[in-house]
From Swiss-Prot:
CC cofactor note: Binds 1 FAD per subunit.
Entry keyword set: FAD, Flavoprotein, Oxidoreductase
Record-listed FAD binding positions: 4-34
Residues modified as S-8alpha-FAD cysteine: 308
GO molecular function, one term: flavin adenine dinucleotide binding
UniProt keyword Oxidoreductase, yes or no: yes
Name used for this protein in its record: N-methyl-L-tryptophan oxidase
Signal sequence residues: none
Protein encoded by which gene: solA
Length: 372
């Protein structure tokens, strides 16, 4: 059988692509080296932020607004356990923060619902938060967080119900191109398609070693908290920048545990074996202490944590482009630790590619040629 589309990597983007392409009537094969959702990539750990006023640059705003529409649609499949939780997101940092300046600019350009607070206003609204006098907060009322593993599980189930073929626990070992399309090699045999999407995440260089993607080991952890830090108490998700420039992110507490991670830093790695479990690097359990001690002093000890990986591009912007010399293969990689919130729209973009539809978005900033 020759498929219309083969998806290599069915985690965040691949699961979405499989669903949207199958729903569009294509004959699709989803593949993954493991059984998604799983612990081997960048999507585990239950939750991921979704921010609209984007500190990484306004080029992302049209994408994230479409992503939010798709998340809302997907959430209707799980109304008892919603995939998107509109907790709000407070972005904290020094008044001269470049990140916060980008957030404010994005909000102004796109007329987003963002409220600016000074230090006293932040601490009056959320007494659990402490910030210096020179800090400001930009509160995104309509943002929140996503249930990442539940989203992937839902997409995969919906795709399967729509007739999508799924080949999991079966790594792709090679990709071949010819005039007739794309062939992938696996331990289970060879499969052919008219087009392919490569969204293999951290280990995409195992298949395409020439790509400018660097895996980085990252950790996040859950710390002892109480009901004051919960969604029920209107405590928001957050990003926070310390005076030294370190960037943190976190979520409202659930079951008396608050999850937090450090966005910058981490350990450069070159193989899956180097991504050692949480606590095998001495600093893992204390990485969030500088933020907790200064901004959330009421949070208690580290309860548990997990390691994941970022697939960083050189400029930490996404790579969304066809494979050089092979216009029938789309790359979606280099998501650099801020990609999950876009998984829905990136999956839709992949499905449009498979149907020979022109994207509704300007993807020029994400081309591979910027690194040449």
């Amino acid at each position: 059988m020759k498929y219309d589309l083969i998806i290599i990597g069915s985690g965040s983007v691949g699961a979405a692509a499989g669903y949207y392409a199958t729903r569009a009537g294509l004959n699709v094969l989803m593949t993954d080296a493991h059984m998604p959702p799983h612990q081997h990539g960048s999507h585990h750990g239950d939750t991921r932020l979704i921010r609209h006023a984007y500190g990484e640059g306004e080029k992302y705003v049209p994408l994230v607004l479409r992503a939010q529409m798709l998340w809302d649609e997907l959430s209707r499949h799980n109304e008892d356990d919603p995939i998107f939780v509109r907790s709000g997101v407070i972005n904290l940092g020094p008044a001269d923060s470049a990140f916060l300046a980008n957030v404010a600019h994005s909000a102004e350009q796109w007329q987003l619902n963002v409220e600016k607070l000074d230090a006293q206003g932040i601490m009056a609204r959320w007494p659990e938060i402490r910030v210096p006098d020179n800090y400001i907060g930009l509160f995104e009322t309509d943002s929140g967080f996503l249930r990442s593993e539940l989203a992937i599980k839902t997409w995969i189930q919906l795709a399967k119900e729509a007739g999508c073929a799924q080949l999991f626990n079966c790594p792709v070992t090679a990709i071949r191109h010819d005039d007739d399309g794309v062939t992938i090699e696996t331990a289970d045999g060879e499969y052919q398609a008219k087009k392919a999407i490569v969204c293999a995440g951290t280990w995409v260089k195992d298949l395409l070693p020439e790509l400018p993607v660097q895996p980085v080991r990252k950790v996040f952890a859950w710390y002892q908290a109480d009901g004051r830090y919960s969604v029920k108490n209107k405590f928001p998700a957050f990003t926070g920048e310390l005076p030294n420039g370190d960037q943190y992110y976190g979520f409202p507490a659930e079951n008396d545990a608050l999850k937090i991670g450090k966005h910058n830093g981490g350990q450069v790695i070159h193989s899956a074996d180097e991504r050692v479990p949480f606590a095998e690097v001495v600093s893992d359990g204390s990485e969030a202490f500088p933020f907790l001690r200064n901004v959330l002093p009421g949070i208690g000890c580290c309860l548990y944590g997990a390691a994941c990986t970022y697939d960083n591009s050189p400029d930490e912007d996404f790579i969304i482009d066809t494979l050089p010399a092979h216009d029938n293969t789309l790359l979606i990689t280099g998501l650099s630790g801020h990609g999950f919130k876009f998984a829905s729209v990136l999956g839709e973009i992949a499905a449009d590619f498979a149907q020979d539809k022109k994207s509704d978005f300007d993807l020029t900033p994400f081309r591979l040629s910027r690194f040449q």
